[in-house]
Amino acid sequence: DLKKKTYVFEGPIDSMFIPNSIATAGGDLISAISDFPKENLVIVYDNEPRSIDTRKKIDKAIMNGYNVCIWPSNMMSKDVNDMILSGLSSDFIKYVIDTHTYRDLKAKFELNNWSKA
């Protein structure tokens, strides 16, 4: 339901745990969702602050006006699937995503901090 907040993941397994989610199965996320309204989309990349590729993808999403999840520094798992395997509930993970979703300048600021973690 695109009238509700929709979570966009790279991988289909991650999208299975969060309600109202879609996955692009790799490739360029921004190109895959360019026809969807941005207001209700949250792009959720893997938790890889050391990955130059991931940081570039998040920066591209921010520059294109999307909401992005910037994982908090105390989340050690690489992705939602790993978080579930480590014992976290899908409700808790959704809460973390919702409370760490940013856009525009705040997203840039959080991305810079996350990259230093």
Predicted regions and their residues:
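TOPRIM fold recognition
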Residues: K3-T6, P12-A117
